[in-house]
């Protein structure tokens, strides 16, 4: 049966109502419709609601400027589909899978997959307890990431989520050589542009596909771009049998776009103005990000926390789907500790003796205990000063401060801003360094020698340069 043709009934911003003849074959929900503008360009709409009497309410994937009532609208007969496969590596796409870099157009016969798909069946799932080494000390020691797991980077505005994601892409591509898919959802175009050229310069881009739906795009594009990136990642997992890294920056913007679309469709909002379907939409996305018997998708998602409020429904809904959380804390940036990861609020289901080993688990637990005790003593220190502490407490505070500074390190991707070379620290070296600090081996060394260094040997070198003689 031929696909039906309708006409624009009304345009309200990014929402377009399309009237089809009532006796026609009406398009299904999530089908893509196309409008050919007067200049020959095409606008894609996605069916969101059926209003009755043959009228379908749709969301535009691009600007609706220049549309008029009565313009012809074609049903494509299926959902939005995007190119997948090895030809997507090294390229940058928009929500519709059109290349937006300066490369060649893809072959028209190239394989395309629908962005709306079911999550893998229960019997196809595979659970892994293998650690993914990142080379970032605070992560590898205290909240190790699982291969095939879901990780959330939580933080307010300007605490370093995007820089941390860039460093993870750099380290994992350099050390593990895996395929990465980076999805920019509602973030700054400048950051995406910088990331693209940085990755091209470092040679990482040839194993990476990038998909962008940035801040200036209509809410429909920002809502669907995460699914476009996920569809590209799923192909490498299911068909090529690869282990894929999926970076999403920022998952909050996915929720925010869904909230805008929901309001435009006339749904009654729920708590704090979010869409009533928030948990469903998040579940449909997150359940597709998983490991199967063929391959794995490890996802690292930046999550903006509005006004640093972790009880907000958007970050709270995301929490339920994660294996590990990395919380970025503003007070640590104020102390000049980067990455500003809160070692006590961050967590991982992988931090168990069975997965990381006895020694790693013991050192990580001791680090957390020392930092927790230091946090408890800070009130006494701020009111009465260090003199009121017992000798044992003074030792705990001194070691905790050295541990806290040693959790910081320079990033490779920040080298051009800081002028300091970045460091990649293997897990064994990280565990060894913290074990020696906790044993008191470096109690006499100046605190500043522990700031922004990689391995423990660098502390000794830095202390010597500062004129310290052990």
Swiss-Prot record:
It is an enzyme of class 7 (translocase). GO terms for molecular function: ATP binding; ATP hydrolysis activity; proton-transporting ATP synthase activity, rotational mechanism. Keywords: ATP synthesis, ATP-binding, Cell membrane, CF(1), Hydrogen ion transport, Ion transport, Membrane, Nucleotide-binding, Translocase, Transport. InterPro entries: AAA+_ATPase, ATP-synt_VA_C, ATP_synth_F1_bsu, ATPase_a/bsu_AS, ATPase_alpha/beta_chains, ATPase_F1/V1/A1_a/bsu_N, ATPase_F1/V1/A1_a/bsu_N_sf, ATPase_F1/V1/A1_a/bsu_nucl-bd. One of its GO terms (cellular component) is plasma membrane. ATP binds at residues 155-162. Pfam families: ATP-synt_ab, ATP-synt_ab_N, ATP-synt_VA_C. Its EC number is 7.1.2.2. It comes from the Bacteria. The keyword Phosphoprotein does not apply. PROSITE patterns: ATPASE_ALPHA_BETA. It is found in: Cell membrane. It catalyses: ATP + H2O + 4 H(+)(in) = ADP + phosphate + 5 H(+)(out). Produces ATP from ADP in the presence of a proton gradient across the membrane. The catalytic sites are hosted primarily by the beta subunits. F-type ATPases have 2 components, CF(1) - the catalytic core - and CF(0) - the membrane proton channel. CF(1) has five subunits: alpha(3), beta(3), gamma(1), delta(1), epsilon(1). CF(0) has three main subunits: a(1), b(2) and c(9-12). The alpha and beta chains form an alternating ring which encloses part of the gamma chain. CF(1) is attached to CF(0) by a central stalk formed by the gamma and epsilon chains, while a peripheral stalk is formed by the delta and b chains. Belongs to the ATPase alpha/beta chains family. This is ATP synthase subunit beta. The gene is atpD.
């Amino acid at each position: 049966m031929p696909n039906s043709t309708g006409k624009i009934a009304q345009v309200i911003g990014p929402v377009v109502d399309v009237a089809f003849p009532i006796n026609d074959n009406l398009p299904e929900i999530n089908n893509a419709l196309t409008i050919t503008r007067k200049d020959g360009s095409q606008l894609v709409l996605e069916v969101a609601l059926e209003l009755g009497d043959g009228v379908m309410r749709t969301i535009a994937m691009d600007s609706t400027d220049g549309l008029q009532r009565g313009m012809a609208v074609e049903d494509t007969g299926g959902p939005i589909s995007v190119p997948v496969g090895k030809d997507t590596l090294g390229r940058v796409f928009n929500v519709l899978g059109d290349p937006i870099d300066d490369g060649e157009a893809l072959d028209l016969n190239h394989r395309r997959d629908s962005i709306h798909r079911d999550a893998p069946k229960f019997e196809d799932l595979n659970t892994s307890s293998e650690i993914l080494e990142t080379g970032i000390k605070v992560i590898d020691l205290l909240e190790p990431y699982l291969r095939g797991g879901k990780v959330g980077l939580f933080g307010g505005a300007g605490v370093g989520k995007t820089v941390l994601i860039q460093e993870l892409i750099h380290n994992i591509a350099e050390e593990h050589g895996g395929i990465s898919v980076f999805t920019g959802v509602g973030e700054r175009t400048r950051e995406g542009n910088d990331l693209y050229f940085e990755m091209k310069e470092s040679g990482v881009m040839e194993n990476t596909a990038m998909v962008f739906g940035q801040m200036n795009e209509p809410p429909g594009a920002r809502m669907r771009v995460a699914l476009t990136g996920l569809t590209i990642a799923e192909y490498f997992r299911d068909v090529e049998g690869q282990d894929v890294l999926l970076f999403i920056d920022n998952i909050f913007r996915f929720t925010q776009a869904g909230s805008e679309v929901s309001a435009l469709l006339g749904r009654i909002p729920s708590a704090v103005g979010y869409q009533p379907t928030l948990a469903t939409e998040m579940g449909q996305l997150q359940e597709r990000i998983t490991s199967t018997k063929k391959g794995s998708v490890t996802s690292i998602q930046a999550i903006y926390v509005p006004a640093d409020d972790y009880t907000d429904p958007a970050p709270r809904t995301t929490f339920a789907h994660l294996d590990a959380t990395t919380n970025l804390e503003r007070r640590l940036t104020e102390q000049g500790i980067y990455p500003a990861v809160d070692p006590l609020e961050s967590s991982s289901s992988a931090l168990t003796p069975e997965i990381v080993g006895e020694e790693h688990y013991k050192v990580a637990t001791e680090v957390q205990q020392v930092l927790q005790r230091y946090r408890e003593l800070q009130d006494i220190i701020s009111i009465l000063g260090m003199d009121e502490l017992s000798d044992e407490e003074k030792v705990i505070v001194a070691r905790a401060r050295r541990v806290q500074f040693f959790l910081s390190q320079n990033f490779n991707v920040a080298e051009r801003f800081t002028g300091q070379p970045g460091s990649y620290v293997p897990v064994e070296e990280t565990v060894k360094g913290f074990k020696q600090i906790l044993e008191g081996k470096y109690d006499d060394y100046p605190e500043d020698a522990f700031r922004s260094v990689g391995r423990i040997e660098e502390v000794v070198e830095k202390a010597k340069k500062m004129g310290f003689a052990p």
